[in-house]
């Protein structure tokens, strides 16, 4: 058996053709879905990049492994304590180690560990390659040569795992200009109207309609050609959507190249392929554009398409974590699932073509805001401890995802019973997880004690000035009232 894991960064589930998207963004992934398993309701337990992949590789939620942020103490694995063995639990029981210790040849082509200082990602990979000499954001045409060379060298061997990380949908949108815009004549999704743009224009927060490039339009210099300075008109909104969707199509082209290579080597029938992501991306949801700042539907709902030789094609609608997909792959390969993992195998469900899944999921964000959410039935309950300077985010929010997938109508006040149900599920889950952890301290509390999420630290005083300069003084006043201790620390 062979396994190719194509890890496409920042790929939200509903922008795939096989998920019903109106643009032809993913013809190659769609082909895999038709012949494999399309999981329709997979969510990253922890977002964004570093927390998500750390949860995936360790098999543990961020509240247990300790990684919920992009900087500070909660951006490193939690110490195992005095009973740490010569070979740490994290190393011995990582997803890649499970294959490596079973005799598989394991390899990863990714700049992610270097970008985030996440050396633990490499635990269990015999070959951990940043062949692009990158720091994240490499285009597929920079990643593919190393992947194709590896497949030429190892592809016909048995029992290998190759992880290939593609960044193209991640902001900034840098698909080569000569690639053009396949979606120039395609309209925006129906849901994003001028009414929504106008509402978002008056909101606050990094990567908002007036600052889709950070806390200021020029925070990172001039935006690339595929991204506008702001969302001041529907033309600019379309440019943002197009830049993202072109990145998806460019990554999908790379998927096609890799599939063709497997065909050329004559190993397609004996190679499993998993296509998934670390997190999604918001395009107006909760006022955020072209980033991943909440524990919400847009950010946490990710695609998962699995082609496994001998497994019947099917659509699975169960509610799953990305950890469940990782665990299922290990089970399908006939390997032992580490006892401490939080993931749940779906092997029996896939064999019987039943959905399976969980009653509810807990979703966490600690790098741009401090939030945990509960996804159950048709509902998403969100609890916010740090708003990431999005002044309109309430402490409690509730959305009907079936009727309102883009989170436009907060029902928390009108549906107190459902909000209380979500709150109770979250409180019980938190207590259960901390009881199983190496430490009784919630890493989210560590983030708050350090002054808040990494990506917003140090920005508040200058951002309050910008809000006042751009006619949004009311949000500046709200943020001043909410964050007095942060202002005292940063001024």
Regions found by a protein language model. Give the residues of each.
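Catalytic domains that recognize anionic headgroups
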Residues: 1-491
């Amino acid at each position: 058996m062979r396994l190719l894991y194509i890890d496409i960064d920042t790929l939200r589930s509903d922008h795939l053709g096989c998920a019903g998207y109106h643009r032809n963004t993913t013809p190659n992934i769609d082909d895999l879905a038709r012949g494999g398993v399309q999981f329709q309701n997979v969510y990253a337990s922890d977002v964004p990049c570093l927390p998500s992949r750390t949860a995936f590789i360790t098999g543990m939620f961020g509240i247990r492994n300790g990684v919920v942020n992009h900087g500070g103490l909660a951006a490193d694995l939690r110490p195992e304590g005095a009973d740490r063995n010569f070979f740490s639990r994290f190393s011995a029981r990582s997803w890649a180690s499970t294959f490596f210790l079973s005799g598989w040849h394991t390899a990863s082509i990714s700049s992610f560990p270097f970008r985030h200082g996440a050396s633990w990602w490499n635990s269990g990979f015999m070959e951990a390659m940043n062949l692009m000499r990158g720091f994240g954001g490499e285009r597929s045409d920079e990643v593919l040569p190393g992947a194709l060379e590896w497949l030429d060298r190892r592809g016909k061997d048995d029992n290998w795992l190759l992880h290939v990380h593609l960044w193209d949908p991640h902001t900034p949108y840098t698909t080569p200009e000569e690639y053009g815009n396949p979606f120039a004549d395609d309209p925006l999704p129906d849901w994003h109207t001028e009414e929504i743009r106008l509402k978002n224009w008056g909101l606050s927060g990094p990567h908002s309609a007036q600052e889709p490039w950070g806390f200021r339009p020029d925070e990172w210099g001039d935006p690339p050609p595929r991204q506008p300075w702001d969302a001041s008109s529907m033309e600019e909104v379309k440019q943002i959507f197009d830049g993202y969707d072109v990145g998806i199509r460019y990554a999908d082209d790379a998927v096609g190249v890799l599939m063709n290579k497997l065909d050329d080597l004559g190993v397609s029938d004996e190679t499993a392929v998993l296509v998934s992501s670390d997190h999604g991306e918001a395009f107006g949801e909760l006022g955020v554009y072209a980033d991943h700042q909440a524990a919400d539907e847009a950010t946490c709902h990710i695609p998962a398409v699995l082609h496994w030789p001998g497994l019947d094609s099917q659509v699975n609608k169960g509610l799953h974590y990305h950890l469940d997909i990782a665990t299922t792959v290990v089970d399908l390969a006939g390997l032992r699932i580490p006892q401490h993992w939080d993931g749940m195998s779906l092997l029996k469900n896939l064999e019987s073509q039943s959905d399976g899944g969980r009653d509810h999921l807990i979703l966490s964000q600690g790098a741009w805001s401090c939030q945990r959410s509960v996804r159950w039935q048709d509902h998403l309950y969100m609890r916010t401890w740090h708003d990431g300077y999005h002044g309109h985010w309430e402490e409690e929010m509730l959305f009907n995802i079936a009727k309102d997938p883009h989170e436009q109508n907060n029902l928390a006040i009108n549906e107190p019973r459902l909000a209380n149900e979500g709150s109770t599920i979250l409180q019980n889950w938190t207590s259960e997880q901390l009881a199983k952890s190496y430490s009784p301290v919630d890493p989210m509390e560590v983030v708050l004690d350090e002054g808040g999420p990494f990506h917003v630290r140090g920005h508040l005083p200058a951002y309050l000035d910008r809000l006042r300069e751009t006619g949004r003084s009311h949000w500046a006043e709200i943020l001043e009232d909410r964050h007095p201790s942060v202002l005292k620390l940063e001024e």
